[in-house]
Design a protein with these regions (language model features):
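N-terminal small/glycine-rich loop or linker at the start of catalytic domains
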Residues: 1-10, 197-202
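Active-site beta-loop-alpha junctions enriched in small/polar residues
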Residues: 6, 35-39, 47-48, 114-116, ...
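Catalytic domains of carbohydrate-active enzymes, especially glycoside hydrolases
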Residues: 18-36, 178
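Metal-dependent phosphodiesterase/phospholipase catalytic core, i.e.
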Residues: 46-152, 178-207
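C-terminal active-site rim and adjoining tail of enzyme catalytic domains
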Residues: 87-89, 159-160, 166-254
């Protein structure tokens, strides 16, 4: 079970509060997004602008990591459609990747790179802190993954490689060999096209690649995907899906 941007349904996404919440809800791994601040420091942020999640505005790349740390990263979070904003003033700032790696020294990560320029600074930091063996690096951008493959750091298949497998599986062809550890795929592409079909997952598994699906918040959908052979769910609500997983796969004690 992978917490999407932490537990983004319970706390402001990509903050320490959300990551803590995910661990508290039972997530076995954490997913988050990384960009570079103006001073070249890798920070957790999904969008190119800070406007959607903080009390500031403008590009992430034009603010230093200190400025981002001083922002209110919980300012925009609302669990009830903007009826309330319970995390204003208490969600903390935008964390650096270093903070996260040091805060969770044993937790597996699915780290999504949002830009090519962030690749090398992130790679160096993973190696410096000894986190390369517990981190899978994902990106839509094939070029962003190259430094990690060259350094034997696990990666997830890029968007292009996902598309290739989807087409091949539709034609009944086997999955190609890829330099990646897993397929981390959207449940739907542009809200229309189902990616983790039965054929897709079967082809990936036959070739030895587990499939993780994002973002799955509905327990019934998660159960369906598990039934197809998907390995992991990337979710905003880890506790909700863990309850469903325990129902679908009860332990002997249960």
């Amino acid at each position: 079970m992978v917490g999407h941007r932490g537990a983004a349904g319970s706390a402001p996404e990509n903050t320490l509060a959300a990551l803590d919440a995910a661990i508290g809800e039972g997530a076995e791994a954490l997913e988050f997004d990384v960009r570079l601040a103006a001073d070249g420091v890798p920070v957790l942020m999904h969008d190119p602008l800070v406007d959607r999640t903080t009390d500031r505005s403008g590009p992430v790349r034009e603010r230093t990591s200190e400025e981002l740390a001083a922002a209110d990263a919980g300012y925009r979070f609302s669990p009830d459609g903007a009826a309330s904003f319970p995390w204003r003033g208490r969600g903390g700032g935008v964390p650096t990747l270093r903070e996260v790696l040091e805060r969770y020294p044993f937790t597996p990560f699915l780290l999504e790179l949002k830009t090519v320029e962030a690749a090398e600074p992130v790679r160096r930091l993973l190696v410096e802190l000894g986190a390369e063996d517990r981190t899978i690096v994902a990106s839509f951008l094939e070029r962003a993954l190259l430094p990690f493959r060259e350094g034997a750091i696990p990666t997830a298949a890029s968007r292009r490689r996902i598309a290739v497998l989807w087409l091949r599986s539709r034609l009944g062809l086997p999955a190609p060999r890829i330099p990646d550890r897993v397929y981390a795929v959207p449940d739907r592409y542009r809200d229309r096209l189902h990616v983790p079909t039965v054929r897709f997952i079967e082809a990936a598994r036959r070739a030895g690649y587990p499939v993780h699906v994002w973002t799955v918040d509905d327990p019934a959908r998660a159960a369906l995907l598990w039934g197809r052979g998907a390995c992991g769910m990337i979710t905003n609500y880890p506790a909700r899906l863990l309850a469903e997983r325990n129902r679908v796969f009860p332990t002997e004690a249960g």
